[in-house]
Amino acid sequence: MSWRISILDKSPVAEHETAADALARTITLAQQAETLGYHRFWIAEHHNTPQLASPSPELLIAWILGQTTRIRVGSGGVMLQHYSPYKVAENFNLLAALAPGRVDLGVGKAPGGLPLSTRALQLGLHPQEKGSFAEQLTQLDGWIRPENQSAEEAVRATPLPSVPAQGFLLGASTESALLAASLDWHFVFAAHLNGDPALLREVVSTWRQNSTRDVIVAVQAIVAESQEQADALAQKVEVWGVE
């Protein structure tokens, strides 16, 4: 069995660094990943978080695409609950038109921040009109697939790229896996957020019963020059859960 390795970068701002330093390091990391043969380079979305420098993965994706030539670049992911599916489709259709065959649209269900930023992002949105997450994702799927848009439609998510962005649903439940399978999207199990091995096996089993696509697993990894350095870095890692 062969494996393809990719990177999900959150653009962390280290102590005594600026956001500009963190973003410059993200660009360098993407270029190094391409040189080393990594398959994908994804950018996360976090709001009102001074330690993380990327609230808008779409903007970073455009910049990274212009600084690389081969590696696939995408979001890991767009927090769809905050946005119009139509506008997300426009953004990623534009990115896909700029770099055909290199753009991934990863979508998440989480807020990507705490309630204060969620309220600010969703100011003026009506929950009844927005619909459920599944309804939003279905709308988005319709906007990014040219075959779903007939010539007679009054509204299209232009430009219509020659190679659409690939759709990925990020999640850690059988419900998310089933939703991705129903839309023929790819699925990413967020083991970096929920590493329960039993849940992973259950979700992967459900996925394989409902989709012929491979499953992607996101994990936390620490890389260093030596095992001792890696162990020292691991001791500094703190994992927080917010309910």
Regions found by a protein language model. Name each.
Residues 1-68:
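N-terminal beta1-alpha1-beta2 module of alpha/beta enzyme domains
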Residues 2, 34-35, 61-70, 96-103, ...:
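Acidic (Asp/Glu)-rich catalytic clusters
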Residues 9-24, 78-86, 161-171, 224:
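Active-site mouth loops of central-metabolism enzymes
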Residues 53-60, 194-207:
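Active-site-adjacent beta->alpha loops and helix N-cap segments on the catalytic face
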Residues 177-193:
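A conserved active-site cap/scaffold subdomain adjacent to cofactor or substrate pockets
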